[in-house]
Amino acid sequence: MSTTWFVGADWLAEHIDDPEIQIIDARMASPGQEDRNVAQEYLNGHIPGAVFFDIEALSDHTSPLPHMLPRPETFAVAMRELGVNQDKHLIVYDEGNLFSAPRAWWMLRTFGVEKVSILGGGLAGWQRDDLLLEEGAVELPEGEFNAAFNPEAVVKVTDVLLASHENTAQIIDARPAARFNAEVDEPRPGLRRGHIPGALNVPWTELVREGELKTTDELDAIFFGRGVSYDKPIIVSCGSGVTAAVVLLALATLDVPNVKLYDGAWSEWGARADLPVEPVK
């Protein structure tokens, strides 16, 4: 495992009563799991003291696109209501697949939180170590949170179109190869098959082992093998902006600079007939 942005279950168990630590449960249903009630799953059992960071609820509901970043003031109010304090060390976890914790990690950092770590192995790893869970909601006093949005963290569709057309940045697509190569339909209806012209495919699952990032040597080999250069700006994308954060986390672990996330992702690009797509049918 690469450890730059991670803490282990043993460390968290030792520090769980530290008043400067706050734990955030960011489990999330993936496309095709719409029948899951992750809020109820959280209530049924979570790491002691963890509040539920509902990525769906914390998205911009004025946008037709899924999981878009909310307005900074909206996010700040939600964090204060959860009892989250931006000056504390926030520990984020998901169910143990590293699917959604990186998105929560990225959101918190994009809105100005400096100390954010991910629990390696997530909830599954915590349970494998026979550590205790608690049930029910966690009620905390109102938190202190004033969002300081970093506009450099995210790009819009016009930025991606320019990067694709002018080759000013590399575009990395985190979706599975079959979706990237237009071999299967997207899980969300109404989207075209294929990928942004010029994009490189680095499926997020190839970067992960048992809910943790692979070693830095392994990550380097994967990125280099897919043609990624660390010397050029990078835009990460995926289906809806969630698993792109896994790629961004891996690149951050490798100290790669100038990496931004395309929040609209394929949910936006694939829905627009006026944007180019590869492979051309």
Curated annotation (Swiss-Prot):
One of its GO terms (cellular component) is cytosol. InterPro entries: Rhodanese-like_dom, Rhodanese-like_dom_sf, Thiosulphate_STrfase_CS, TST/MPST-like. Its EC number is 2.8.1.2. Pfam families: Rhodanese. The active site is at C238 (cysteine persulfide intermediate). GO terms for molecular function: 3-mercaptopyruvate sulfurtransferase activity; thiosulfate-cyanide sulfurtransferase activity. Residues 17-135, 165-278 form the Rhodanese domain. It is found in: Cytoplasm. Signal peptide: none annotated. Its main location: cytoplasm. Substrate binds at R179. It comes from the Bacteria. Residues 238-244 are annotated as: Substrate specificity. GO terms for biological process: DNA protection; response to antibiotic; response to oxidative stress. Changing S240K: Decrease in 3-mercaptopyruvate cyanide sulfurtransferase activity; increased affinity for thiosulfate. Monomer. The N-terminal region is the non-catalytic domain; the C-terminus contains the active-site cysteine residue and the CGSGVTA motif probably responsible for substrate specificity. Contains two rhodanese domains with different primary structures but with near identical secondary structure conformations suggesting a common evolutionary origin. Only the C-terminal rhodanese domain contains the catalytic cysteine residue. Catalyzes the transfer of sulfur from 3-mercaptopyruvate to a thiol-containing acceptor to form an intramolecular disulfide releasing hydrogen sulfide and pyruvate. May be involved in the enhancement of bacterial growth inhibition by serine. This is 3-mercaptopyruvate sulfurtransferase. The gene is sseA.
